[in-house]
């Protein structure tokens, strides 16, 4: 049975990680993110999509194990958004407002200039090929430019990069993850 002290400590830990002032704005951020992707897809799905591949894209091989990096980015983004939201109320709101404005720009771009690319065929049946197929099944080859993946990675880093209260190793780690 949990004691009052352990429940209180759990609540204090939760409030440090996810302060009350950040909960609704962070929830709105998640809803907005999906709305931008799915809303743009619903509006521009039948529009002509522009293939933005270059000859460089044709020269870069698909290396299936790199799918781990893609899925690992979600962990980085969650940590990055929680970290930035927990810094203080003003920082949280500025950080999330930057996200919301940037996502509005992305939405406009996705509707005005829909983009796509040609994905290579995934061959094989090992775990890496299966993970790539799973990725392709859940992440359509549209809404590519501008890249929300790059956007949120960079936001996570720039949200903390100049803050001397954030340990240098965390700032460096965020920078490496963003790149």
Give, region by region, the residue ranges found by the protein language model.
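Membrane-interface loops
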Residues: 43-55, 85-169, 173
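Hydrophobic alpha-helical transmembrane segments
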Residues: 67-80, 149-155
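Alpha-helical transmembrane segments
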Residues: 33, 84-85
């Amino acid at each position: 049975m949990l004691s009052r002290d352990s429940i209180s400590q759990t609540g204090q830990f939760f409030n440090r990680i996810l302060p009350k002032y950040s909960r609704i704005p962070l929830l709105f951020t998640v809803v907005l993110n999906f709305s931008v992707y799915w809303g743009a897809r619903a509006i521009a799905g039948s529009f002509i999509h522009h293939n933005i591949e270059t000859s460089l894209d044709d020269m870069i091989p698909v290396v299936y194990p790199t799918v781990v990096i893609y899925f690992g980015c979600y962990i980085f983004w969650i940590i990055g958004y929680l970290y930035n939201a927990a810094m203080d109320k003003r920082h949280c709101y500025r950080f999330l407002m930057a996200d919301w404005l940037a996502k509005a720009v992305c939405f406009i771009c996705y509707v005005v200039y829909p983009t796509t690319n040609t994905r290579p065929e995934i061959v094989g049946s090992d775990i890496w090929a299966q993970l790539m197929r799973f990725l392709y099944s859940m992440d359509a080859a549209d809404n590519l430019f501008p890249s929300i993946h790059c956007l949120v990675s960079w936001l996570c880093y720039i949200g903390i990069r100049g803050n001397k209260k954030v340990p240098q190793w965390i700032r460096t780690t965020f920078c490496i993850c963003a790149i």
